[in-house]
Design a protein with these regions (language model features):
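Conserved G1/Walker A P-loop phosphate-binding module
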Residues: 1-49, 62-63, 67
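Alpha-helical transmembrane helix bundles of large polytopic membrane transport and channel proteins
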Residues: 95, 105-249
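Alpha-helical membrane-interface segments at transmembrane helix boundaries
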Residues: 256, 260-264
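Conserved C-terminal guanine-recognition region of P-loop GTPase G domains, centered on the G4
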Residues: 30-32, 55-124
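Residue-level signature of catalytic and energy-coupling elements of molecular machines
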Residues: 3-4, 22, 37-39, 56, ...
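Conserved nucleotide-binding/hydrolysis micro-motifs of P-loop NTPases
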Residues: 19, 42-43, 74-78, 100-105, ...
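Signal for well-folded cores of large energy- and translation-related assemblies
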Residues: 8, 45, 60-61, 88, ...
């Protein structure tokens, strides 16, 4: 919300989302009145358990959003990137605002933004809502991505066996789901997400085919489908973080050790 206020200033409208008592805030970008931003309720995943989470998820899957500005807490990167992977899979172009970067610096930690962007496959901009840095840049990046197509996007890649199952489910789905979000729906069906299963008008044949794909994959992994996806997401996130994170304290200690060795010699 702090970032939203900085981007929109006083150009805001406040109301409720239809059918629920969840506050709805939208606004025009101060420096580009052609851009409208919806301040969605904060969520940690695309599996909703509260009215606020369902509002955010439903809006993102409504095909109305041209771009997602994903605010990531730089001090809690791994937990926040779990949602980021799911947002990328919606097929909507994502730009990540790596917020609270100033707090991270104070902890003696660094994130290589370029490496994070490369391995995530989305634009990433370091921001600080408190110090009001990086705000204009991240809005420009997000605006630029609105022209991207699904073919331009890079999705998180998981274990080959899970990828094979996702591909098979995509074949079964065909045109039964919006093509932009097809991968998202395929993964959610693999996880046996009850909300998605209820929303989609699939034939009995399609449902049986998907059940068989899930059963065989669970036997191969010797895990249940939901656990397979959770573990694969975190494995992907861990690889990304290892590539992008560094600790200045660790570096200083290593440098000190090197100097000690030189002096000793």
């Amino acid at each position: 919300t702090s970032l939203f206020n900085l981007i929109t200033g006083h150009n805001q409208r406040v109301g409720n989302w239809p059918g629920v008592t969840v506050e709805r805030k939208s606004g025009l970008v101060k420096k580009n009145k052609d851009l409208e931003i919806q301040d969605l309720p904060g969520i940690y995943s695309m599996s909703p358990y509260s009215p606020e989470e369902k509002v955010a998820r439903d809006y993102l899957l409504s095909q109305r959003a041209d771009s997602i500005l994903n605010v990531v807490d730089a001090t809690n990167l791994e937990r926040n990137l779990y949602l980021t992977t799911q947002l990328i899979e919606t097929g909507i172009p994502v730009t990540s605002a790596l917020n609270m970067i100033d707090v991270l610096d104070g902890q003696g930690k660094k994130i290589n933004v370029d490496k994070l962007s490369y391995h995530l496959g989305v634009p990433v901009v370091a921001t600080s809502a408190l110090k009001q840095t990086g705000v204009d840049q991240v809005v420009k990046k997000a605006a630029h991505t609105t022209t991207s197509t699904v073919g331009d996007l890079a999705f998180p890649i998981y274990d080959d066996r899970l990828e094979a199952a996702i591909s098979q489910i995509l074949e079964v789905l065909g045109n039964s789901v919006p093509q932009r979000s097809a991968r998202f729906y395929a993964i959610k069906l693999f996880e046996q997400d009850s909300l998605v299963e209820a929303e989609l008008d699939l034939s009995q044949f399609q449902r049986k085919e998907i059940e068989d794909i899930i059963r065989i994959t669970e036997e191969i992994f010797t895990e249940d489908a939901e656990s397979i996806v959770i573990n694969e997401r975190y494995a992907f996130i861990e690889r990304v973080c290892q590539m992008a994170e560094s600790h200045t304290e660790d570096f200083a200690l290593t440098l000190s050790d090197k100097i000690d060795r030189i002096v000793s010699n």
